[in-house]
Every structure is written in C-alpha cells, then in structure tokens.
C-alpha cells in the first residue's frame, strides 16, 4: 500500500517526517535521558550497536509520547511513523554510505 500523502491538517499520520526531524527527535530523547540523570551510554554513537541499544529501547518505549510540531503540521504523532523510525534505528552504515546505496538503487536505470 503506498504511503498516504500528508494533508498537513493537524493530526498527521502520513509519511511526512523528514530524516532531520527524526534525528532531532533522537537528540531530544537523549537530552531527556540526560535531564533525568539517566546518563548511561548517552554519548554512544548509533553505529555502536551494544551501547546505543539502551537508547533505542528508550525511543521505542516512548514513541507514543513523542510529537513533532512544526509549521507544516500542528501535531504529528511519532508513533504513527514507527516503521520508518525502526528502519532508521536499524541502519548499520553511516548516513553517507546509506545515501549512496539508496541513490544507486533508485537511479540504476536512468530514464532521462
């Protein structure tokens, strides 16, 4: 089933979260852990699978509480984007490598 297009009319449940918004969400989740003095592995890199796992679990457990508010949409419930977030949390390459992989896959057959 193709993703729904975002109408930006409030409670958005379509695939309109950008990667940078998701990265900002990850940073805010880590900042929340720091604020509550849960500082174990908060400096871990996403590719450090063992150390970052605790942060991933925190993000997964709290997806229902996260909301992204921007000028595009008044409230985008993050839990509705759980598949995309799970995919991003599962990437085991740096983003530059992942970008090159996706671009080469998409543009393998040039049509122009």
UniProtKB/Swiss-Prot annotation:
It holds the Pfam family Baculo_LEF-11. It is found in: Host nucleus. Keywords: DNA replication, Host nucleus, Transcription, Transcription regulation, Viral DNA replication. One of its GO terms (biological process) is DNA replication. The keyword Chaperone does not apply. Residues 42-61 are annotated as: Dimer 1 domain. InterPro entries: Baculo_LEF-11. Residues 72-101 are annotated as: Dimer 2 domain. It comes from the Viruses. GO terms for cellular component: host cell nucleus. Homooligomer. Plays an essential role in viral genome replication. Involved also in late/very late gene activation. Belongs to the baculoviridae LEF-11 family. This is Late expression factor 11. It comes from Autographa californica nuclear polyhedrosis virus. The lineage of its organism: Viruses, Viruses incertae sedis, Naldaviricetes, Lefavirales, Baculoviridae. The gene is LEF-11.
């Amino acid at each position: 089933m193709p993703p729904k297009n975002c109408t930006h009319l409030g409670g958005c449940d379509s695939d309109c979260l950008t990667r940078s918004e998701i990265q900002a969400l990850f940073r805010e989740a880590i900042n929340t852990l720091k604020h509550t003095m849960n500082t174990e592995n908060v400096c871990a890199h996403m590719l450090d699978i063992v150390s970052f796992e605790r942060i991933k679990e925190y993000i997964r457990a709290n997806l229902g509480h996260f909301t992204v508010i921007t000028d595009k949409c008044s409230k985008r419930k993050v839990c509705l984007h759980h598949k995309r977030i799970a995919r991003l949390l599962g990437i085991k390459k740096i983003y530059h490598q992942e970008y090159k992989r996706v671009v080469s896959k998409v543009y393998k057959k040039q049509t122009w």
